[in-house]
């Protein structure tokens, strides 16, 4: 069953032929969203996002502690997996909130560009 689902998703999206866009990723991530109340449960992906973000932080902490801030190939591969999990939870949380990833990404860059133009990238506060 697992192999069939993977084959179905991989067939739908030809990973070797084109770069993946945010909304395409979100659509494919939704196909793997198997949790209680999927489609009307924003709590699960929100908590998952916190957990996976913590795993990224934990790996970074160990790189600082054990490897003198040097990220080798093994650490990079582990971080890539964890960052992928973070991305999955972001995509599914956004979908639960009826938001699309392309719009989120675009609005975020617009916000940051505006802050940069006004010289307020540094500082604190959501509405600077």
Describe the predicted segments one by one.
Residues 2-83, 87-128:
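Flexible "arm" and connector segments at domain edges
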């Amino acid at each position: 069953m697992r192999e069939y689902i993977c084959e179905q998703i991989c067939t739908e999206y030809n990973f070797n032929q084109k770069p993946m866009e945010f909304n395409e990723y979100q659509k494919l991530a939704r196909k793997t969203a198997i949790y209680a109340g999927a489609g009307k449960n924003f709590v699960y992906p929100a908590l998952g996002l916190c957990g996976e973000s913590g795993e990224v932080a934990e790996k970074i902490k160990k790189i600082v502690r054990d490897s003198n801030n040097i990220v080798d190939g093994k650490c990079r591969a582990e971080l890539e997996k964890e960052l992928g999990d973070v991305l999955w939870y972001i995509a599914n949380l956004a979908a639960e909130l009826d938001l699309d990833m392309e719009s989120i990404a675009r609005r975020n860059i617009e916000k940051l560009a505006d802050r940069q133009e006004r010289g307020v990238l540094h500082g604190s506060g959501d509405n600077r």
